[in-house]
Amino acid sequence: MNALTSWTQFFKNIPIALIVFVFLYSGIFTKEYETNTLILILTKGLSRYKVVFAKFFVMFTMWTIGYLLCFAVTYGYNAFFWDNSIAVGLLPAMVHWWLFGVWIIGLIVLFSVLVKSYTGVLLGTGGSVLGVYLISFFPKAWKYTPTTLMESASLLIGTKSIEDYGIAVLITILLVVICLIVSITVMNRKQL
């Protein structure tokens, strides 16, 4: 066993953490709909777009802190027992998975605004990821999908280069922005 094996395992385990994250935060709006606490906040003068940004920011912050903590523990563990220099594309691979998580957060916010049920948010988020994942099976579409970022562990061993993921990174950032814009637009018109 070496640091490369440990990092490969780290990137295989991140999807589990992301699934748990989705289950924890899919109710971020739906609980407010059920208890009508969102109406109280809005009647006190808080803008709807600020509510959307606040919810996104909370999830973004929790994902970033949790992810960086897991990364730091793994990095320290590998530095203590082995040499991290064997993993050549470690930083880009880490950023790609983090960005993939940010896209998931954008989807959670979008579906939380679109539907009023926890199950609907889970199905919408999971269905979107599954749909994009299936699209990535087409060789010509692979480099354009956010799910490409899940395969960035191949950067560790040098079978792919950072340039192979450039378009996917830009499209993922664009999709996060689109999710937020659509969420704010729908939230501004939504009857609560």
Task: List each language-model region with its residue ranges.
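Secretory targeting signals
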Residues: 1-28, 52-119, 125, 154-173
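Alpha-helix N-cap/start motif
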Residues: 48-49
